[in-house]
């Protein structure tokens, strides 16, 4: 009786222990591997019916038998590279979308500011100086066209733009506004340059040059930096996996399939090392990218006062109006100086064209017209601050790119095991166990790819340019000594009301004069109408589609099956054996 009980006890022990054992050489079942592969490549029947030696495999070389053929390995290599590229595009999509959307918004907003500035200037000339006629309108239109082309990257010089504008405006000013008419002996060409020698417009042309130079240059560099940011991210997003990278990805993701481990997940150190090697040295971009974000933020914070295109251009009509009023106030002096410079024949007295009532009323019309300014909250400064705040969230983008790609790996059902490139191993080895380190070509540090070296050089260049544009503003403000009182540029006759908009460095909102860093989330503020319109047209699609293209959610997931990594088919065989033993015991007891 006792020997029989011992036999039954031994059999019961086998029943309990066998299903949970993990043999070193498990029996492979290639049926699920075939189903998984045909899900990826329908109609392809390259999966062997039974395990084979795998002697022709180049990467997924087994210690024993395998369920993969050489053609399967080639196909797995191709899809591994595609998954890597799709995952990289999805990871970069949010950053790329942020820069692209804001570049388009700012481009259109700057164009809108120029259009509003042009319209307000034309309105001033039409209402306050109607005698200047269509010629003045043409000069204004050309000036703003040149400004628009400049911020887009033209080789024009801002000082030359302003000089050309006043050169076209002065003959009209001299003949129509100052009442000199068609004076004999004075050529049009001489009049074009006479405003400089006669100081007809006072210091206002120089003031206009200074403000436009600073604001337009800052705007131009800001847009240039945004476009370069798009290029940098776009280059990274479209990196292609090379031969060595493809082999490493194959070993990382699909070699477990050959061992019928369809739900095996790679160990984290191996994944990070492999991604780092495949990214072609993009970690070298990180310090330059971080400097790019910081320098762009510094420029955005400095773009106020004389470096803010909105503040300068929307008040440009004030400077032009004061310049014309300066010429009218100095009519006798200007006329005499122009005659001395341009009249070569003996001067003869000519009857001056009387100044019409519409000319004399110029100084009173402007005070009855409402100011043409934006709502103080609808500022480009606020929008720039909001953009920089979002961009700072990506300041470590390149240092964590490999980690981000590995974070998109689906979690395994058995959290204690992972694939180390050769076999399933403990994900968290105990203190007495040797930790498996990544090995092979993927762990070697390589020099950056040529395309990465190119974007590093471009980042260095734009960072230097951003510093050059930002630093002069800091030095200029230091020289101002905190913004003391200015000398009235047009003499004692100009009132404070006339100088509206001419104070440099003014801030309409105290909060807007602070820097960007350390402010936390930007306050919710009104947007320029163009922002509201473009936000709908340029909205970035969600990344659901991209998420579906990430590193392989293995084909067995689609069939609804799930198993423990490292033991995909052992439980099935053990279950059958267990049922057999139970039946045997039952019959024996009977």
Swiss-Prot record:
Knocked-out gene: effects: Morpholino knockdown results in severe defects during epiboly with most embryos arrested at 60-80% epiboly.
GO biological process: cell migration; cell migration involved in gastrulation; coronary vasculature development; negative regulation of canonical Wnt signaling pathway; negative regulation of smoothened signaling pathway; positive regulation of canonical Wnt signaling pathway; positive regulation of endocytosis; positive regulation of protein catabolic process
Residues that carry a glycan: 119, 234, 414, 504, 517
Region of interest (Disordered), residue spans: 429-450, 476-520
Family from the record: Belongs to the glypican family.
Intracellular or extracellular location(s): Cell membrane
Residue spans of biased composition, Acidic residues class: 495-513
Record-annotated disulphide pairs: 30-67, 60-255, 68-258, 190-342, 245-278, 267-418, 271-406
Protein's job: Cell surface proteoglycan. Negatively regulates the hedgehog signaling pathway. Positively regulates the canonical and non-canonical Wnt signaling pathways. Binds to CD81 which decreases the availability of free CD81 for binding to the transcriptional repressor HHEX, resulting in nuclear translocation of HHEX and transcriptional repression. Inhibits the dipeptidyl peptidase activity of DPP4. Plays a role in limb patterning and skeletal development. Modulates the effects of growth factors on renal branching morphogenesis. Required for coronary vascular development.
Chief localization: membrane
Subunit structure: Heterodimer; disulfide-linked. Cleavage by a furin-like convertase results in production of alpha and beta chains which form a disulfide-linked heterodimer.
PTM annotation: O-glycosylated; contains heparan sulfate and/or chondroitin sulfate. Cleaved intracellularly by a furin-like convertase to generate 2 subunits, alpha and beta, which remain associated through disulfide bonds and are associated with the cell surface via the GPI-anchor. This processing is essential for its role in inhibition of hedgehog signaling. A second proteolytic event may result in cleavage of the protein on the cell surface, separating it from the GPI-anchor and leading to its shedding from the cell surface.
GO cellular component, one term: cell surface
Topology within the bilayer: Lipid-anchor; GPI-anchor
Expression by tissue: Maternally expressed and is almost ubiquitous during blastula and gastrula stages but becomes restricted to the prospective hindbrain by 24 hours post-fertilization.
Annotated signal sequence range: 1-25
Name of the protein described by the UniProt record: Glypican-3
Keyword hit for Signal: yes
Parts of the chain that traverse the membrane: none
Keywords: Cell membrane, Disulfide bond, Glycoprotein, GPI-anchor, Heparan sulfate, Lipoprotein, Membrane, Proteoglycan, Signal
């Amino acid at each position: 009786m006792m020997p029989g009980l011992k036999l039954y006890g031994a059999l019961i022990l086998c029943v309990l222990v066998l299903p949970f054992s993990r043999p070193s050489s498990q029996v492979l079942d290639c049926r699920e591997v075939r189903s998984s592969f045909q899900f990826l490549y329908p109609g392809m029947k390259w999966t062997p019916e039974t395990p084979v030696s795998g002697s022709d495999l180049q990467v997924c070389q087994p210690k024993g038998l395998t369920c993969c053929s050489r053609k399967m390995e080639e196909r797995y290599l191709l899809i591994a590279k595609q998954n890597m590229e799709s995952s990289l595009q999805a990871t970069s999509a949010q950053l790329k979308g942020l820069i692209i959307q804001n570049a388009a918004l700012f481009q259109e907003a700057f164009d809108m500011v120029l259009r509003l500035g042009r319209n307000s200037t034309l309105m001033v000339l039409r209402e306050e100086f109607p005698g200047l006629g269509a010629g003045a309108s043409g000069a204004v239109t050309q000036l703003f066209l040149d400004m628009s082309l400049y911020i887009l990257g033209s080789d024009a010089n801002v000082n030359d733009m302003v000089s050309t504008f006043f050169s076209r405006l002065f003959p009209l000013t001299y003949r129509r506004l100052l009442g000199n008419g068609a004076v004999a002996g004075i050529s049009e060409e001489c009049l074009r340059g006479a405003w400089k020698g006669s100081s007809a417009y006072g210091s206002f042309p120089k003031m206009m040059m200074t403000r436009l130079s600073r604001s337009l240059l800052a705007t131009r560099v800001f847009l240039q930096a945004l476009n370069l940011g798009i290029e940098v991210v776009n280059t990274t997003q479209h990196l292609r996996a090379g031969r060595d990278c493809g082999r490493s990805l194959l070993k990382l993701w699909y070699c477990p399939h050959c061992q019928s481990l369809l739900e095996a997940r790679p160990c984290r150190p191996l994944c990070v090392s492999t991604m780092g090697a495949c990214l072609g040295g993009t970690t070298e971009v990180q310090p330059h990218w971080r400097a790019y974000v910081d320098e762009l933020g510094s420029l955005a914070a400095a773009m106020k006062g004389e470096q803010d295109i909105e503040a300068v251009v929307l008040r440009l009509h004030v400077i032009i109006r004061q310049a014309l009023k300066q010429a009218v106030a100095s009519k006798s002096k200007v006329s005499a100086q122009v005659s001395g410079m341009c009249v070569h024949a003996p001067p003869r007295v000519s009857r001056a064209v009387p100044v019409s009532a519409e000319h004399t009323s110029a100084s009173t019309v402007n005070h009855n017209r409402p100011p043409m300014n934006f709502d103080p909250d609808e500022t480009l400064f606020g929008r720039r601050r909001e953009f920089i705040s979002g961009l700072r969230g990506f300041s470590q983008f390149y240092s964590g790119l490999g980690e981000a790609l590995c974070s998109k790996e689906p979690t395994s059902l058995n959290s204690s095991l992972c694939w180390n490139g050769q076999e399933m191993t403990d994900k968290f080895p105990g203190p007495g166990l040797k930790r498996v380190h990544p090995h092979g070509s993927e762990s070697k540090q390589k020099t950056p790819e040529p395309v990465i070296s190119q974007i590093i050089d471009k980042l260095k260049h734009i960072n230097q340019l951003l510093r050059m544009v930002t630093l002069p503003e800091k030095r200029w403000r230091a020289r101002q000594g905190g913004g003391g009182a200015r000398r009235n540029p047009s003499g004692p006759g100009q009132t404070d009301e006339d100088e509206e908009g001419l104070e440099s460095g003014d801030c309409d909102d105290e909060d807007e004069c602070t820097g960007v860093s350390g402010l936390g989330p930007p306050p919710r503020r009104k947007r320029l109408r163009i922002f509201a319109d473009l936000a709908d047209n340029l909205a970035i699609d969600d990344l659901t589609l991209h998420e579906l293209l990430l590193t392989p959610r293995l084909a067995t997931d689609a069939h609804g099956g799930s198993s423990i990594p490292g033991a995909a088919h052992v439980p099935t065989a053990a279950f059958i054996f267990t049922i057999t033993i139970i039946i045997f015991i039952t019959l024996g007891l009977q």
